[in-house]
From Swiss-Prot:
Record InterPro entries: Ac_CoA_lig (IPR011904), ACAS_N (IPR032387), AMP-bd_C (IPR025110), AMP-bd_C_sf (IPR045851), AMP-binding_CS (IPR020845), AMP-dep_synth/lig_dom (IPR000873), ANL_N_sf (IPR042099)
Gene Ontology biological-process entries: acetyl-CoA biosynthetic process from acetate
EC number(s) given by UniProt: 6.2.1.1
PANTHER family for this protein: ACETYL-COENZYME A SYNTHETASE
Protein name, UniProt field: Acetyl-coenzyme A synthetase
Organism in which the protein naturally occurs: Photobacterium profundum (strain SS9)
Amino acids binding ATP: G387, E388, P389, D411, T412, W413, W414, Q415, T416, D500, R515, R526
Reactions accelerated catalytically: acetate + ATP + CoA = acetyl-CoA + AMP + diphosphate
Length: 649
């Protein structure tokens, strides 16, 4: 491996940071030797209605997997994110909304946020929503998305947010699985100057015969665009809140009461409803936000993630607001209307902490200094990366160009399932290596195991697992605990399997090497290959399909589809477009294949299993050593695929 450049800890940052290297090591040791004592102390980072006496009650044992933290305590998330700040910072901005159009913005103080959340909480109650009911959000990136989330938590409803880029079919599937009672949406969203037909998509989803649980749809007027109206079902947000009281007492919730369901892509078809509960999740999101971003009084924090992803939950809304921070919520994209938009927003709002994705960084990097044209970015103090491993070249560009070589970069590794950041540098404590997520956060116990599950010590490469629980860990898959155990705990007994590969270097730093299961990472969004394959095979002209990921300069991975057509069907430019449009409709634009490879046959073992390893190598042009092909039923298929590869559209 080439020489790795090490960036020492920035001493100016270290002087005021919450922890230095020595303190990190000491706290980390405490957290793994005595997790009970450590989390008893740090569980106090949030306000409890009824204090907990029990801290950790967890098991990774096969057949008995159970995760419970602070299980006899009670609290309310909304009260922790808003009410507890009113006496000390009521007039401080809580949310700064920056519209898609650079002239569009709005600020909500903690007092104003409190009023809006209480009103919308009462509006939800007036539409029949009660504690424990599931509410589905399909929203644009507007402040009302955060208000709706906080209102759900205030009254004890469970929210499930579906990213606004998902299709009506994908939305319907998630509504059915979660048994949601009400949908919150907008007439339209706005993204890069284009309208997104959210209400129409909801109407289409609810027309699906399998969707039977939805009673009401609350619609926010974002653009004023024309929408179909179902008067017995649809309610305008502004009308529902106009008559609502601005007082709403927060519901007392048990630490293990469900907080939200968030669907993530599985390697076996149907998306999985990851369940996070109230106490452990909030403690972990609050604590990681404070330490990972070294949050200090007066910081303005901007996370560019959509609320529809876990990063938007933990580090756009809950983590920042629980810490009393000012969080920027951005409707647009980092390169619209110009390549320098991200830098312009930093200057406009004096952003001091920026958290974005390698995809955005690579897209801006391709434009060189255009990304910083006419901006100073002098307010920046800390920068972060999330969503996928960042390649060293992009890390260096982000550091030198966006951050003027001044700002530490926290390259964070975590998942929807983990609730919060697991492996990360801390700004005042960790020397940085571009491309490495570095060291585990407090209480996090990673290990690297070989394919037999043997723990590898020292410098090693293999499968990344966690050997013990942490408060932010998911509790189960909604309605399917068996699948939860099967997915995460059956591969390596007694350990949580992340699905990622990693290597550990001589300094104990972790480097994430990518997925080892059949899940793609497209622009930081996880997509199951099986979900895309299922959509393709549902197309009436396709007999069989296999999906692999190939490297992509901007998106990290592109989608490469091998397709076998039904007898009598002939590949054509028209069919090529039909297939892409079909996947876009079934799942959403993000799942659209970048490459279609028409073929008569796929490489299969004698037992009928598709050999994806070989398909990956062919797709990436790495055909020099295909490894063991002795189990192939028909080895000639491989040569044919290699020849066909030359003509891929």
């Amino acid at each position: 491996m080439s020489e790795v450049h090490v960036y020492p800890v920035n001493q100016e940052i270290a002087a005021t940071a919450h922890v230095n290297d020595e303190q990190y090591r000491e706290m980390y040791q405490q957290s793994v030797i005595n997790p009970e004592g450590f989390w008893r102390e740090h569980g106090q980072i949030v306000d409890w209605i009824k204090p907990f006496t029990k801290v950790k009650h967890t098991s990774f044992d096969t057949g008995h997997v159970s995760v419970k933290w602070f299980e006899d305590g009670t609290l309310n998330v909304s009260a922790n994110c808003i009410d507890r700040h009113l006496a000390t910072r009521g007039d401080q901005p809580a949310i700064i909304w920056e519209g898609d159009d650079p002239t569009d913005d709005a600020t909500f103080t903690y007092n104003e946020l409190h009023e809006q959340v209480c009103k919308f909480s009462n509006a939800l109650k007036s539409q029949g929503v009660r504690k424990g009911d599931v509410v589905c959000l399909y929203m644009p990136m507007v402040a009302e998305a955060a208000i709706a989330m906080l209102a759900c938590t205030r009254i004890g409803a469970v929210h499930t947010i579906v990213f606004g880029g998902f299709s009506p079919e994908a939305l319907a599937g998630r509504i059915v699985d979660s048994n949601a009672k009400l949908v919150i949406t907008a007439d339209e969203g706005v993204r890069a100057g284009r309208a997104v037909p959210l209400k129409k998509n909801v109407d289409d989803a609810l027309a699906n015969k399998n969707v039977t649980s939805i009673e009401k749809v609350i619609v926010l007027k974002r653009t004023g665009g024309n929408v179909e109206w179902h008067s017995e079902r649809d309610v305008w947000w502004h009308e529902a809140t106009a008559v609502a009281s601005s007082h709403c007492e927060p519901e007392e919730m048990n630490a293990e009461d469900p907080l939200f369901i968030l669907y993530t892509s599985g390697s076996t078809g149907k998306p999985k409803g990851v369940l996070h509960t109230t106490g452990g999740y909030l403690v972990y999101a609050t604590m990681t936000f404070k330490y990972v971003f070294d949050y200090q009084e007066g910081d303005v924090y901007w996370c560019t993630a959509d609320v529809g992803w876990i990063t938007g939950h933990s580090y756009l809304v809950y983590g920042p607001l629980a810490n009393g921070a000012t969080t920027v919520l951005f409707e647009g994209v980092p390169n619209y209307p110009s390549t320098s938009r991200m830098s312009e927003v930093v200057d406009k709002h004096n952003v001091s902490i920026l958290y974005t994705a390698p995809t955005a960084i690579r897209a801006l990097m391709a434009k060189g200094t255009e990304a910083i044209k006419g901006t100073s970015r002098s307010s920046l103090r800390i920068m972060g990366s999330v969503g996928e491993p960042i390649n060293p070249e992009a890390w260096e560009w982000y550091h030198h160009t966006i951050g003027d070589s001044r700002c530490p970069i926290v390259d964070t590794w975590w998942q929807t399932e983990t609730g919060g950041i697991l492996i990360t540098p801390l700004p005042g404590a960790t020397a940085l290596k571009p491309g490495s997520a570095t060291r585990p956060f407090f209480g996090v116990q990673p290990a690297i195991v070989d394919n037999m599950g043997n723990i590898l010590e020292g410098v090693a490469e293999g499968n990344l697992v966690m050997v013990d629980s942490w408060p932010g860990q998911m509790r189960t898959l909604w309605g399917d605990h068996e699948r939860f155990e099967q997915t995460y705990f059956s591969t390596f007994q007694g350990m949580y399997f992340t699905g990622d590969g990693a290597r550990r270097d001589e300094d104990g730093y972790y480097w994430i090497t990518g997925r080892v299961d059949d899940v793609l990472n497209i622009s930081g969004h996880r997509m199951g290959t099986a979900e895309i394959e299922s959509a393709l095979v549902a197309f009436d002209k396709i007999a069989e399909a296999a999906i692999v990921g190939v490297p992509h300069d901007i998106k990290g991975q592109a989608i490469y589809a091998y397709i076998t057509l039904n007898d009598g069907e002939i590949p054509s430019a028209e069919l090529h477009k039909e297939v892409k449009d079909w996947v876009r409709k079934e799942i959403g634009p993000i799942a659209t294949p970048d490459f279609l490879h028409w073929t008569d046959a796929l490489p299969k073992t004698r037992s009928g299993k598709i050999m994806r390893r070989i398909l990956r190598k062919i797709a990436t042009g790495d055909t020099g050593s295909l490894g063991d092909t002795s189990t192939l039923a028909d080895p000639s298929v491989v040569d044919k695929l290699i020849a066909e590869k030359q003509t891929i559209l």
